[in-house]
Amino acid sequence: MFPESDVLENLKIAGYLKKRKEVKASIEYVFDMFPALSKLKTRKAGFMSGGEQQMLAIGMALVVRP
């Protein structure tokens, strides 16, 4: 997680090796799983609470889909 980047940027960074369509679909999936995170799209990760940061970290892992 990059504290100086916002939620959407962090999710895009997590999927940088994937195709754009896949990343977009994965990000939508993350926002469906974590509706609270979708409301924080423009918030910098460093200014989020610990629980919100955990949601973002899990969301980033889901974008990668190992």
Would you name each region that the model predicts?
Residues 37-41:
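Signature (C-motif/LSGGQ) region and adjacent switch/coupling loops
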Residues 4-24, 33-35:
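ABC-type ATPase nucleotide-binding domains, specifically the catalytic core motifs of the NBD
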Residues 53-55:
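ABC ATPase nucleotide-binding domain signature region
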Residues 58:
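Hydrophobic anchor residue at the start of the ABC signature
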Residues 63-66:
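A short, proline-enriched helix->beta-strand linker immediately N-terminal to the Walker B motif
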Residues 30:
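Active-site beta-strand/loop architecture of penicillin-binding DD-peptidases
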